[in-house]
Curated annotation (Swiss-Prot):
HAMAP family: HscB. Signal peptide: none annotated. The keyword rRNA-binding does not apply. This is Co-chaperone protein HscB homolog. Co-chaperone involved in the maturation of iron-sulfur cluster-containing proteins. Seems to help targeting proteins to be folded toward HscA.
């Protein structure tokens, strides 16, 4: 996980719900202070430390601004690492995944730009619902299994959203 805690680095309390604008503002403030260019005339040791601090800051920011990564990080803070590869016993969601993938393939085959936009909005709604569900249960040890399941769903939707963006770019060409 690295030290210090990603949240402490940004002077935030560990929480799933974050003000992303506040996070970005704080990131820019901190990044200015450790940017390697500011240490161009410093000793080699100071340059290396600045580079390490900058890398740590970037990693923390990338983790906290991305809901699935933030969810995984919070779960790791609360009870140890979450296995990356596990057998998912979630037949309803597996079925939903298959339906979404088939629909995305159809949209690609048909080059349906308007359909992709509708699909993207539905994904965003599903992501928002997952985020709210996770926010409500991540800090409850009795709901750890549910929180992990939601985090895995969030990861899938994040990946699917990336694939939708790639499809949009191909259709725009």
């Amino acid at each position: 996980m690295g030290t210090p805690c990603h949240f402490a680095l940004f002077e935030l309390q560990p929480n799933f719900r974050l003000d992303l604008e506040q996070l970005a503002t704080r990131y820019r403030e901190l990044a200015r202070g450790v940017h390697p260019d500011r240490f161009a005339d410093a000793s080699e040791r100071e340059q290396r430390l600045a580079l390490e601090k900058s890398a740590s800051l970037n990693e923390a920011y990338q983790t906290l601004k991305n809901p699935p990564k933030r969810a995984r990080y919070l779960l790791a803070m609360n009870g140890g690492e979450v296995p990356i590869e596990v057998t998912v016993h979630d037949p309803d969601f597996l079925m939903q995944q298959m339906q979404w993938r088939e629909e995305l393939e159809d949209l690609q085959d048909e080059a349906d730009v308007a359909g992709v936009a509708v699909f993207k909005r539905r994904l965003k709604t599903a992501q928002d619902e997952l985020n709210e569900s996770f926010a409500a249960c991540w800090n409850d040890a009795a709901q750890r299994e549910q929180a992990e399941r939601l985090m895995r769903r969030m990861q899938f939707l994040d990946k699917l959203t990336y694939e939708v963006r790639q499809l949009e770019e191909r259709l725009d060409d």
